[in-house]
Amino acid sequence: MMVEPNQLVQHLETFVDTNRSSSQQDDSLKAIASSLENDSLSITQLVREMEMYLTTTDNLVRARGILLLAEILDCLKAKPLNDTIVHTLVGFFSEKLADWRAMCGALVGCLALLKRKDVAGVVTDIDVQAMAKSMIQNVQVQALALHERKLAFELLECLLQQHSEAILTMGDLLVYAMCEAIDGEKDPQCLMIVFHLVELLAPLFPSPSGPLASDASDLFEVIGCYFPLHFTHTKDDEANIRREDLSRGLLLAISSTPFFEPYAIPLLLEKLSSSLPVAKVDSLKCLKDCALKYGVDRMKKHYGALWSALKDTFYSSTGTHLSFAIESLTSPGFEMNEIHRDAVSLLQRLVKQDISFLGFVVDDTRINTVFDTIYRYPQYKEMPDPSKLEVLVISQILSVSAKASVQSCNIIFEAIFFRLMNTLGIVEKTSTGDVVQNGNSTVSTRLYHGGLHLCIELLAASKDLILGFEECSPTSGCANSGCSMVKSFSVPLIQVFTSAVCRSNDDSVVDVYLGVKGLLTMGMFRGGSSPVSRTEFENILVTLTSIITAKSGKTVVWELALKALVCIGSFIDRYHESDKAMSYMSIVVDNLVSLACSSHCGLPYQMILEATSEVCSTGPKYVEKMVQGLEEAFCSSLSDFYVNGNFESIDNCSQLLKCLTNKLLPRVAEIDGLEQLLVHFAISMWKQIEFCGVFSCDFNGREFVEAAMTTMRQVVGIALVDSQNSIIQKAYSVVSSCTLPAMESIPLTFVALEGLQRDLSSRDELILSLFASVIIAASPSASIPDAKSLIHLLLVTLLKGYIPAAQALGSMVNKLGSGSGGTNTSRDCSLEEACAIIFHADFASGKKISSNGSAKIIVGSETTMSKICLGYCGSLDLQTRAITGLAWIGKGLLMRGNERVNEIALVLVECLKSNNCSGHALHPSAMKHAADAFSIIMSDSEVCLNRKFHAVIRPLYKQRCFSTIVPILESLIMNSQTSLSRTMLHVALAHVISNVPVTVILDNTKKLQPLILEGLSVLSLDSVEKETLFSLLLVLSGTLTDTKGQQSASDNAHIIIECLIKLTSYPHLMVVRETSIQCLVALLELPHRRIYPFRREVLQAIEKSLDDPKRKVREEAIRCRQAWASITSGSNIF
């Protein structure tokens, strides 16, 4: 669209006029830029029209005009312009840099021209030089306002970053101008650019005789004053500049050129001795970068001072507490703060970069005196704190230095390892002065803790260094020097560590810890470079395994040994150590799995399972071995119980299954190819149950049944469909062979159902529970044989009181196909047929409904199930079981989006009425079950009908139930005639609304908030409903913290406050009191006029909460009192 001349003038006037809004000015800018972009207006025409605005003596108009032209150019960076126009514009904006009133526009224009795309016409080197000279001569950066300063720095950054070759000839002038421009800058955004400018400037002038070298002192004086960075800006700054970013920028600036070395290193060493932790951290980080970038030749002169400062930093940042806990086996054993970590990093950098620095370390007097300390104090606890600190620091310094490189490791070992072995009693000097191994070292009664700690640190350093080499390299010859020393002493070292492990006196915890840690370190040397032979490695495994299998209970040494074995197993698996894996399998895994399969291991079975599962989880082959072992152990123990009535065996089965489910199944799920192993385990469970015809004695094995159900669910849930079918077929064959099928002949009539008793044998109950678990976890694509008979069986057992049967029925109706091409869990039963069996209509005569599904399906109050729920049968037990079963069936239907759930919901609602269609007054227990049925329907279940167990889940199913049920419950609450019915209706409503997504609540807050408040009031009268009360209170809390809910809360403020005040003294649940006080604080977001009238009542109620027996409640009360006390009558009422 072409801009007419009069429109262009209007746009120009709008932008220049400072009285116009920023949005109007932006619109004018966009309109002009768009015209230029689509060539309906040329840049020449625009400049001609703007001549008056660009040259007028009115400073404000001229500044706005120049800024407009600059902003337009910024929008057209990719639009081609010919060289003449670009050259002219460069000249114009370079000249305007002298016009301080138009400085902003001039800087924006220069930046826009410098950033033009290559294909669109760019500035020439001559133009760049002219612009740079104009800037240096005319722009006093520090005299500008913040925005203009930032633009000026960005212009300098662009010159250095994109046009560096063009400005190289400016030399001294450029460096001097840079110093002048950045001197005294304080704004964080500008400083980020300033530090980058120095970093960009350094590589332009690398010559020792260049301008940067001669002016390095002045430039460093300008930036050095910022170190260490003192950052006071808040987190609310728009630019969101962090101290870490600024500090990193300053670090890069300081280390950018070696010409800063004479000034930077002394400054950094001085700040390293500061008492401010942040100064120490910044100094250490900067020294590390400087060491790398300045080079060895420049750093050498500072080595003495560096070592002294670094050593002092190690001493000041290290505590004297050395942990001997299990978690410390794979760590140094003491807390490392940021200062310590950065000191370690710097030391490693210095040693790795120049091996001569290691001379300062090795020759230090404290390195030599540490051996006297070790010898003087054999026990760590006997050491005074200065001695403990000395041992820990020197050990850390030597370990870090050894880990820096192969050469440094060799030097460290050659300097102190023999002396350390002598201190530990492993070597001794003969009369001729020769050093030989002490043959009696293993029987020494004194173990030097400091020496053991230093030895382990050095061994760990050597081990970690070897791990860094994937294979032997040309430098591995150097590695032999240090490793050969370890190899020559590996046998006595392992003996010393083993001796420490075997200590059994009261003061042996440190001995045991250091012994196990030493064995662990020796056992984790890698591959061909390992100084530990296979025989010695196996001796380590034997020692640690013998501790696990010893009949000594769960002691400290047992836990340490287990942790060490797990670490070694993980190490073997990670680095694919095939030889070590064979040893680990035969010595550790086989022994522990054998114990797990044994009924007479002499140890608590839980300990054996814990050790075996932890060890075997470290590798796929070990997992496979354990699952097979557990399968054998399960069959053996279950058989022992069936035959001999050994209750210890059935208890072992329970623990075994829990171990399999909780420890191994998650690991198996991560490993490809092990699924069939679990399927075989599940089928073996069924075979063993089938083989054991009857118990030798009856028992109440609820724990075993629950463990077996959980395992079966998990295994079936992760199995493939074909594998699920195999398990289902085996399970069905076992069910068919027991006494359970006899119940299929029980007619679904009141006469037959009233005679039902919960009288299944323990074996039948186990079979039923396991079969229900299989059905619960099966995929919709799995095939269930003889589904109609099984549905009848599950329905009867449901009415006998077995909840797993109800959950299985809910899962079946959730996954069954519709019979018309839908997903089929069973080939011989459609969803309609299943519902026909469950909701049996023709009950009076005792006739079954037609199995071909031709009869009309009625789910409402005329079905057998619904009449049982409504109390027609006269049996309270049967009534409550039917209600619970109906809830699980309804949940399955609801999740798949089947409309039959509405009829089920209506039956449950009918049970909540004071006068229902049955004409009978329902028992309070039945009404309670009906109310809680809505919790089953709406809440998420861990044991069935979830994604893990392949449930069919239709989106928004909870929202649909909410929209259907809530209006019905609301109407019934309003018309309820008894307090019991009213309470139960509120319980049902609470279950519904506390289980829907919060967005649903917020969208309906205006309607729901009065109901929630009434519900809180009603439910607070009965302690039985305390958990339901809390869930409802959480819903209210969610509405009070959202803007949608606050709008409704404003209208009900007096009722809400009154309700919450009562709940602050609710005696039955602490979290109710705590949450109600938090809600009172949230109410302060409401308009002042709504809440201020209740200030006195709230403060009086909170005074009582200050004496609450629970600390959390008292803390919330203090916050609430302070918040409510702070509002005054003069606060803003709008």
Curated annotation (Swiss-Prot):
Key words, A-Z: Cytoplasm, Nucleus, Repeat
HEAT repeat ranges per the UniProt record: 959-998, 1002-1047, 1050-1089, 1092-1130
Main location: nucleus
Family matches, as Pfam families: MMS19_C, MMS19_N
InterPro entries: ARM-like, ARM-type_fold, MMS19, MMS19_C, MMS19_N
BP-aspect Gene Ontology terms: protein maturation
Compartments (UniProt record): Nucleus; Cytoplasm
SUPFAM superfamilies the UniProt entry points to: ARM repeat
Domain of life of the organism encoding this protein: Eukaryota
Disruption phenotype: No visible phenotype.
Cellular component aspect of the GO annotation: cytoplasm; nucleus
PANTHER family in the cross-refs: DNA REPAIR/TRANSCRIPTION PROTEIN MET18/MMS19 (PTHR12891), MMS19 NUCLEOTIDE EXCISION REPAIR PROTEIN HOMOLOG (PTHR12891:SF0)
Quaternary organization: Part of a complex composed of AE7, CIA1, MMS19 and NAR1. Interacts with AE7.
Function recorded in the entry: May select specific target apoproteins to which a Fe-S cluster produced by the cytosolic iron-sulfur (Fe-S) protein assembly (CIA) pathway is transferred.
Family from the record: Belongs to the MET18/MMS19 family.
Protein name (record): MMS19 nucleotide excision repair protein homolog
Organism field: Arabidopsis thaliana (Mouse-ear cress)
Gene from which this protein is expressed: MMS19
